């Protein structure tokens, strides 16, 4: 094989790679909705992520932004299930850099126990879905 043939093969391979391997892009951008703030920070939920699963529970992406952020206290990203009839929730996964970074294997249903931020998410998400 001569140089021209090798060059043609390499360029053809590069073109095929570019055409058939598009960059990863998120299908939907986030549409963050804030719940009333608390003394600890702010909680938001993503309107574009709301899904009703086969059990009738609602899955939503949520983000907690602490009042003051440092290397130790930073934004926390949650994938959470909401039980509208029971006013309860469970954290399915959590992360700091991306959603679903760490799966929660023991995701038991929890009572918000008066937490205004979580209650705000539950109330708003349930009103949005109905």
Residue ranges of model-derived segments:
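Bacterial N-terminal signal peptides
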Residues: 11-20
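A general, composition-driven signal for non-globular sequence regions
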Residues: 1, 17-18, 31
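N-terminal secretory-pathway/extracellular module detecting exported/lumenal segments
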Residues: 23-78, 83-130
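Bacterial N-terminal signal peptides that target proteins for export
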Residues: 2-10
